[in-house]
Amino acid sequence: MIFATLEHILTHISFSIISIVIPTHLMTLVYEIVGLCDSSEKGMITTFFCITGLLVTRWIYSGHVPLSDLYESLMFLSWSFSLIHIVPYFRNYKNFFSKITAPSAILTQGFATSGLLTKMHQSAILVPALQSRWLMMHVSMMLLSYAALLCGSLLSITLLVITFRRKIDIFGKTNHLLISSFSFDETQYVNFSFRNYHRYQLTQRLDYWSYRVIGLGFTLLTIGILSGAVWANEAWGSYWNWDPKETWAFITWTVFAIYLHTRTNKSLQGANSAIVASMGFLIIWICYFGVNLLGRGLHSYGSFTLNI
């Protein structure tokens, strides 16, 4: 009872803090206030430790790693987003993820704590097939890979938005120059060039970090799929069964393998590879969320305890 109450308290504290962090981040987009930025970062750190405490508490009183159903996996995914958020902060890197990870964490946790998954808030006894040492290895690797791949994909989507906006601005500016070619203002040209250079630098950094994060996520996804295959062989006598979850995991792996391949070709870097990563964003959600709710197979559990 004490552990359940503690888990309930930590859930609401983390959700409340992160709800305050998001509008704070939005304000920092308009006003560069150092104190405000620092407060929002500390808020995310507090959220990370609250979710960590929540998961540890659930682990203690349930007797198994909290990765057995949709609610627990969503909370772990929210924890993963928070982890990705705070790593650049401690390494003193410019945090390109802050505007992505904070909303991702609150949306994930918000759905997990909503009334739709009320039945899953109480921990259930694991079915025999899940009582394996591979549970933590396989599921944690898959969820960490989803978090990394989603963040990398969102960076690529941001890159595409900036790139296409720049092309529209250039097209509009070109038309303006053709109309007023005899009254061209040199100051406007300098400002226009500076903005383009700044956008170019930003897109380069976004491309670099999306590649790094997706590369990490792809590695974790590969480990997760391989460990799942070994576990499947122990539980069901077959490494691969082509059920919906396995099929979509393979599709996800293939899409991001194509992305990494395009990044090796300089002519396809930037917007071209970002388009592939953007497609991967949708594929991940189908693999993780859609199959769980709508699919049939060995991994399909929807709003109930995982049945294998």
From Swiss-Prot:
Cell compartments where the protein resides: Plastid, Chloroplast thylakoid membrane
Pfam families, alphabetized: Cytochrom_C_asm (PF01578)
Gene Ontology terms for molecular function: heme binding
TM spans (from-to): 17-37, 43-63, 70-90, 142-162, 213-233, 246-260, 274-294
Membrane association type: Multi-pass membrane protein
Keyword Lipoprotein: no
UniProt superkingdom: Eukaryota
Cellular component per GO, a single term: chloroplast thylakoid membrane
Keywords, comma-separated and alphabetical: Chloroplast, Cytochrome c-type biogenesis, Membrane, Plastid, Thylakoid, Transmembrane, Transmembrane helix
GO biological process: cytochrome complex assembly
Family (UniProt): Belongs to the CcmF/CycK/Ccl1/NrfE/CcsA family.
Annotated function: Required during biogenesis of c-type cytochromes (cytochrome c6 and cytochrome f) at the step of heme attachment.
HAMAP family in the cross-refs: CytC_CcsA (MF_01391)
Subunit-level organization: May interact with Ccs1.
Protein name according to UniProt: Cytochrome c biogenesis protein CcsA
Organism of origin: Nymphaea alba
